[in-house]
């Protein structure tokens, strides 16, 4: 803090959840922490007095079809789930095909996962298509990343 004396700083006390994110791996780990750490989730999103302002999209609610299963996941509206989702974050408009398993993954908006796929520790950017019978696997310390608008 060699320039601390030259500036004017404002601070405030924060007693809630905090995560230092300085890398892609940190982002992945701390984001998924919201699916398993109830204290972190409620500290950030569970306080009624702390409103979250966002754009309204008037999207359909999530559709859970026969054979679907969801555990410890955050799922945005307009998603269609036919497979199994565990400890994952699905953004708006994600589609999970029949028989597919998505674990410990973050799928950004518009991602489509085909039938009988297996995804573990995967991060997809927007509008990614994952073909039927595809297996993608990363690790907690090095998640598998699929860039925007790619087809795998």
Region annotations inferred by a language model:
Residues 1-152:
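Left-handed beta-helix
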């Amino acid at each position: 803090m060699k320039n601390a004396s030259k500036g004017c700083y404002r601070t405030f006390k924060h007693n809630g959840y905090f995560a230092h994110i300085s890398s892609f791996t940190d982002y992945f780990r701390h984001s998924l922490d919201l699916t398993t750490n109830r204290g972190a989730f409620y500290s950030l999103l569970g306080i009624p007095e702390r409103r979250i302002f966002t754009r309204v999209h008037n999207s359909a609610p999530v559709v859970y079809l026969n054979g679907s299963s969801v555990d410890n996941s955050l799922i945005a509206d307009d998603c269609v789930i036919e497979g199994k989702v565990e400890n994952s974050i699905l953004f708006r408009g994600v589609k999970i095909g029949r028989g597919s398993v998505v674990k410990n993954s973050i799928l950004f908006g518009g991602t489509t996962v085909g039938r009988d796929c297996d995804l573990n520790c995967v991060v997809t950017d927007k509008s990614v298509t994952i073909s039927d019978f595809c297996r993608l696997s990363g690790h907690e310390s090095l998640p598998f990343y699929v860039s925007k608008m790619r087809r795998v």
